[in-house]
Amino acid sequence: MGRFISVSFGLLVVFLSLSGIGADQECLPGWSFYEGHCYKVFSEYKNWVDAEQYCTEQENGGHLVSFHNREEVDFVVKLGYTILKADIVWIGLRDFWRECHWEWSNGAQLDYKGWSDEPNCFIAYTVGNKWLRRKCSSTQQFICKARVPH
């Protein structure tokens, strides 16, 4: 009986591993999984354009992080603070044409807002969960978001 339970448990572990239930196993090493996407915090300081380019070079479909609900913001804020112990990171939101037409660097529609009125790129505080506009030429640490690799 003990051998049957042991074998059954072993098969369950193998099945769960292969089916992708093991969270971070769906992302490349160093990336964190949440709701179908992979996230990675970078401690390098870059301006917004260079940070976005760096994200696109990291993984297929990668961009500076975009948010689509409060739960995703909470996950990313916690991830950023845990790794960096810093309070500000670039996010993918920018007024590309300087006409107050805000969109994410990955082309997604802005469907969740969290900022005060102020330049043309956005930072997020990893403490207090606030977004602020900042000059795109200033340098910050950043977080990339990418699709899960297939």
Swiss-Prot record:
Residues 1-23 form the signal peptide. The keyword Secreted applies. Pfam families: Lectin_C. Residues 34-145 form the C-type lectin domain. Expressed by the venom gland. Keywords: Disulfide bond, Hemostasis impairing toxin, Secreted, Signal, Toxin. One of its GO terms (cellular component) is extracellular region. One of its GO terms (molecular function) is toxin activity. It is found in: Secreted. The keyword Lyase does not apply. Gene3D superfamilies: Mannose-Binding Protein A, subunit A (3.10.100.10). Belongs to the snaclec family. Interferes with one step of hemostasis (modulation of platelet aggregation, or coagulation cascade, for example). Heterodimer; disulfide-linked. This is Snaclec CTL-Eoc125. It comes from Echis ocellatus (Ocellated saw-scaled viper).
